[in-house]
Amino acid sequence: MLNIIVVLLLLFFSNNVIDSRYISYSKPNYYKTNDKIPVYMNNVRSGLSIFDYYKYPFPKPSTIEYKQSFMSKLAGDLNSTSLYDEVSLHTSVDCIALGKPINYTLDDVNQLKYLIDKHFRINFFIDDLPIGELFKNNRLVEYNNSNSKSSEITSPPSSPSSSSSSSSSPSSSIEEEDDDDTENDHIYLGHPIGFKYNSKYYLYNHLIIIINSTSTKSDKGFYTIKSVNVEPYSCVDCKIDSGIGGVEISPELFDDDKIKQLTIQYTYSIRNHETTTTNSGKSFQSWSIYYVNQFKLSNIDIIMSFIIVLAVSACLAIILLKIFRKTNSKTYTQLSPDDGGWKSIYADVFRSPNNFMTFSIIIGFGVQIVASLFILMVFSVAGLTSIATPGGMAIASILIFSFTGIFNGYSSMRTYIMLGGTRKLYNSVITTTLIPFTILLLMFIGYFQVWSNKFTYGASIGTVFFILAMWLLVCVPCSLLSSYFVRTWPPAEYPVRINPIPRFIPTAKWYQNQYLHMILGGIIPFVIIFTDLSFFLSSWVLGEHYSYSLSFALTFILMIISIVETNMIIEYYQLSLENYNWWWRSLLGPMVTGLYTFIYFIYFGITRIETEGVGFYYFMFSLVFSILVSLFCSSIGFLGNLWFTKKIYSTLHFD
């Protein structure tokens, strides 16, 4: 226990020092002054509603080409050609026309009105870096052309006056800002399409693109792009003077019979911000600004979780001390009436449960999830799943889960043999197919809504075949092989013999109800992972990026400890009531954590998702995720209880 505490403390104090989010193993692109920087359009997004940028009436080239790799398809990125042809390094230009003027009909305006109401944001890439709005200390930074310095506002521009607060003569460069305090800098991905003010709708038709480049003394004229942030404006002829109204696109304008369409010209300007560093490796840290700084909240949550685990550990330590101090030195010929409680059921406690085929299958798949998450956690801490490689987390999850099928077959077969099973071949086949097929089927059903709405992250035919191939050609053989090699191993031994005649179980009182224990036992692990769940949902649903490195590792370890210890305490209480049916309870109790997770997912979806057409997909994903959490917790709870039960009954010595 002391070693675990030392490891947790070391991880906690290094949480703010070492973080995989700063690590990117992809080489940056190098540019010289006036070199063209490629720009690729991506999507229009609000929550889980993600569409192709060119689906809507925005400026588009005559020929649209898509530069997609397999990993970018997994991430849902499109990378299509754009009209941003004048984006160059160290070349500041003003008011460049983005294609030809667009004539908007009433239907087009209603489309844009819907996008504004639902808070859709436009996403694209410059030098493979996602663009976004820059926030410093949770305040939006707005470019101010009158004095070449940045001013700050507390929220994105929401009115013609606030969005047009700059002077009429844009400056050609930006003075270097103080980069020393960048801890709370954050780029919020994408930029809004427009805004609503006094019941009128305005379109952001002008974009200031700010390119932050860096170089070292050894680069000899070569630069890398550190980050790119943008500032949208609603203006006419690039005039973003204070007091000039924006471009109104309210449908009410068409009430005038003379107006049949609205003609709008999109424009953009380029600004460059150059810095010089002495450390050549600093250019690799550009991805840190795309992560939300959650260290303060994570640290508070970790401290609270650590206190909870310490309290549970203290309770368990008292129980173990009581057992081993009073029992381990005794030798029994026959138990006396004073030796009741858990000692009196020693001959029944290892009696095999009902439906132990299903029991072993659940254990096997749960262990596979545990192994997958552990390996994925190691990769995350090592920085191998950085957002610098879109789709990296998805491909890593698929590959790791496929190869950890070896733990599935091994654990299921060992449990099945221990419980006295004889249909070993049947167990091997069902273990490797039943739950994985059910999970894949539920995900496939959920994706019907994604495909019908043509969201960009809808799995392609190639992706579907890849997942099926990894399951059938890698996961299934690994599981079957591991089952085959352990099928002849002798079953694990119990410390006591089993009585052939089952013992009578006393009637329990209302507060000794197993369902009450399950509800209470599932709360502690859920409380520990609650903050990380909220980060995960914000990342997945809202498009924010959060770090899943050391903070996730700490939460992962604390959650496992809490599941094991809470389950041991509940089982000890149950055995003290002379109830030896602990097998299924050790499995079902931790599963309640998955139920709490599902309830929280549904609550998050109801309160945070604004767009239509994603409800069924979100529900199915929440269901699948909660099932995986339940299986993860149940396997850990059972393995902990099995060790605990063997340990305490090994203290009973009989002549």
Curated annotation (Swiss-Prot):
Domain of life: Eukaryota
Compartments it resides in: Membrane
UniProt keyword terms in alphabetical order: Membrane, Receptor, Signal, Transmembrane, Transmembrane helix
Molecular function terms from GO: transmembrane signaling receptor activity
Matching Pfam families: EMP70 (PF02990)
Region (Disordered) location: 146-185
Name under which the protein is recorded: Putative phagocytic receptor 1c
Organism: Dictyostelium discoideum (Social amoeba)
